[in-house]
Every structure is written in structure tokens, then in C-alpha cells.
């Protein structure tokens, strides 16, 4: 999966322009405020850093981790261009090698769906270890219905003047790739 995102890094946000990042970021900001979260956050599977940047602009101290080095390069470049300070690290969600703890951990865009089943328990243990006592774990995941009924054995395409994107998925007994 990392290799696919490596190749998408320059086009990721462009191809996801239908995702309302500002509204979704506002949803996170409202939720974090309502839950009384502290100001130090970790985003797992941060990709190009859209949520890290939005939360940093709102005064949060953000760290983003992702497996894809090119996506992290893009994230760091966009953060610099937007004048926000975010730390980015290449890391596997099942490892999360940093020792510090965070007030909250975000994992939007169903990033935990991309973790192989045998690594998922370690990923959740690492997420818990990275949270301060009482910290907030906020993740979304795709349902079995979506994966089996909408994504599996399907093709997705986006043809634009600058780029054409084709993705194929296959259903396996324990996962969709």
C-alpha cells in the first residue's frame, strides 16, 4: 500500500478535492474542544498533512506519522508554505517509535483499515501507549458493508487533464486490497 501512496503524493490532495477537509477539520476541532482534549496531538496516517495543518493553525501542537516518505515530504512542504509548524515522522502505526505521549490521537480517512490484520493488535497497543492518561483516541474505519459491497472487486477512476488515476481492488477472505 505504501508504494501506491508514494506515487500519489504530488496528486493526493488534488485527486481528493471532493473531500471537504475544512469542514472535517472543524468537526475535529469542535469535538476535541467538547471532549476537553489537551493541545498536543498525533495523527496516524497523516498523508499530505491536511488535518495536521488545520489543527496546527488552530493552535494545536501536531505531529503526523505516515509510512510514505514522499507523502511526508509533501506534508512538510505544504506546512512550510502555509507557515504552520508540524512535526512529521515516517513510522508504521504498529510501531510508533517516538517515546512522547499525546493528549489525543487522530486516525482519519480509515487508515487503520490499511493495517494488515496480524499487525492490528500491535497498532492499537502502540496507540494506547502514545496517549497520556485519559487521552482521546479518535479513528474512523470503513465498515464490512462498505469494504465488501462497495470497494471489493471494483475499479475506481478519475480522468482529469493533468492526471488519470485508476485503482483496482480485490476481496480476500480477511481483507480488501
Regions found by a protein language model. Give the residues of each.
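A short acidic, Gly/Pro-enriched loop at the edge of an enzyme's catalytic core
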Residues: 97-104
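Residues lining the SAM
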Residues: 108-109
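A short glycine-rich, Lys/Arg-flanked "PGG" loop and its adjoining helix->strand segment in the class I
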Residues: 121-133
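A short His-aromatic
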Residues: 113-114
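SAM-dependent methyltransferase
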Residues: 118, 138-177
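Class I SAM-dependent methyltransferase SAM/SAH-binding core
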Residues: 50-95
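Conserved class I S-adenosyl-L-methionine
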Residues: 1-36, 38-45
Amino acid at each position: 500500500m505504501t508504494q501506491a501512496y508514494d506515487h500519489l503524493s504530488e496528486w493526493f490532495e488534488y485527486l481528493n478535492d471532493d473531500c471537504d477537509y475544512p469542514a472535517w477539520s472543524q468537526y475535529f476541532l469542535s469535538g476535541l474542544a467538547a471532549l476537553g482534549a489537551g493541545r498536543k496531538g498525533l495523527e496516524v496516517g497523516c498523508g499530505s498533512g491536511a488535518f495536521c495543518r488545520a489543527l496546527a493553525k488552530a493552535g494545536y501542537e501536531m505531529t503526523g506519522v505516515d509510512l510514505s516518505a514522499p507523502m511526508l515530504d509533501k506534508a512538510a512542504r505544504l506546512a512550510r508554505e502555509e507557515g504552520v509548524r508540524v512535526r512529521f515522522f515516517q513510522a508504521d502505526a504498529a510501531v510508533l517509535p517516538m517515546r512522547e505521549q499525546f493528549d489525543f490521537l487522530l486516525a482519519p480517512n480509515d487508515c487503520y483499515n490499511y493495517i494488515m490484520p496480524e499487525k492490528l493488535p500491535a497498532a492499537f497497543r502502540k496507540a494506547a501507549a502514545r496517549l497520556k492518561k485519559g487521552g482521546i483516541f479518535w479513528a474512523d474505519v470503513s465498515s464490512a458493508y462498505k469494504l465488501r459491497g462497495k470497494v471489493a472487486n471494483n475499479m475506481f477512476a478519475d480522468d482529469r487533464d493533468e492526471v488519470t488515476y485508476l485503482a483496482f481492488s480485490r476481496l480476500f477472505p480477511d481483507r480488501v486490497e
